[in-house]
Amino acid sequence: MARHSFFCVDGHTCGNPVRLVAGGGPNLEGSTMMEKRAHFLREYDWIRTGLMFEPRGHDMMSGSILYPPTRPDCDVAVLFIETSGCLPMCGHGTIGTVTMAIEQGLVTPKTPGKLNLDTPAGLVAIEYEQNGQYVERVRLTNVPAFLYAEGLEVECPDLGNLKVDVAYGGNFYAIVEPQENYTDMEDYSALQLIAWSPILRERLNEKYKFQHPLLPDINRLSHILWTGKPKHPEAHARNAVFYGDKAIDRSPCGTGTSARMAQLAAKGKLKPGDEFVHESIIGSLFHGRVERATEVVGQDRTLPAIIPSIAGWARMTGYNTIFIDDRDPFAHGFTVA
């Protein structure tokens, strides 16, 4: 019997939780972060479930673990953990991780105000604004984002037939826009969106293939992005992003905002240099920007893409030393359907 101890820094990004594991993470094998992610999922997934699931976490919990970088052009590597698994990239998680890591002295940047993160999805460039000991704002330049498919049909309980676009912004997103059987996220409760989303995701993954052209391990749709008209005067659009099994992102979602900008750019509604302010279900904002156009060249297809950036803020809420005790029947956590 053993008691495993994890020292965590807890916080939130624009309302969505981030648990940064600053001590106790396992040593991982692999020459890339995607390989290390696979090793973690294979042998240490109990750490993820123990820290993210009840009774130590909850349905919306997400987090990260810091590692030395696997590539010379990066300052630090990040493994993202959440209730649904280990995401290749997490926008709100990145903003929270950078904020807390800088404020707590866990990372020493080579250039003040800038960081390069080694993530399973690739290099993520960071610029941050610091006021004394506090990080006030973080802007991440994300991996290439692209529109993957348009007008995919799927049957939704209660609503009926829906058409969705699927875009990639670090994860694959089904984007539900206003149409005959769907009006606006404001017209439905969060509980309804939570009930419908996993069914849509399962049906879409069964009916269609989603494969990143360059990253073989990214091969399924994981998120549903419900759109709506903004309430905040600065925002261009509003969204409710479903992830995991029962969670609606409280932040505007970084990879979701990246995917949304890629979709709009592919349809001629955004161009390089354009700003896109995205509002969350609780009214917090991410400030997105199309940095430049690019393309993703795979063996079978070449996709027009953008390099998006996302800016937001995070706040630390406290320190947390968490035990995962082998004597505990709920050592590895649990979820309630």
Curated annotation (Swiss-Prot):
EC number: 5.1.1.8
InterPro entries referenced in this protein's UniProt entry, alphabetically: Pro_racemase_fam
KW S-adenosyl-L-methionine (keyword) present: no
Keyword list, A-Z: Isomerase
Catalytic reaction equation(s): trans-4-hydroxy-L-proline = cis-4-hydroxy-D-proline
Pfam family, one: Pro_racemase
Reported function: Catalyzes the epimerization of trans-4-hydroxy-L-proline (t4LHyp) to cis-4-hydroxy-D-proline (c4DHyp). Is likely involved in a degradation pathway that converts t4LHyp to alpha-ketoglutarate. Can also catalyze the epimerization of trans-3-hydroxy-L-proline (t3LHyp) to cis-3-hydroxy-D-proline (c3DHyp), albeit with 170-fold lower efficiency. Displays no proline racemase activity.
Active site (catalytic residues): C90, C253
Gene3D superfamilies: Diaminopimelate Epimerase, Chain A, domain 1 (3.10.310.10)
Annotated protein name in UniProt: 4-hydroxyproline 2-epimerase 2
GO molecular function, one term: 4-hydroxyproline epimerase activity
Record-listed substrate binding positions: G91, H92, H223, D249, G254, T255
Family of the protein in this entry: Belongs to the proline racemase family.
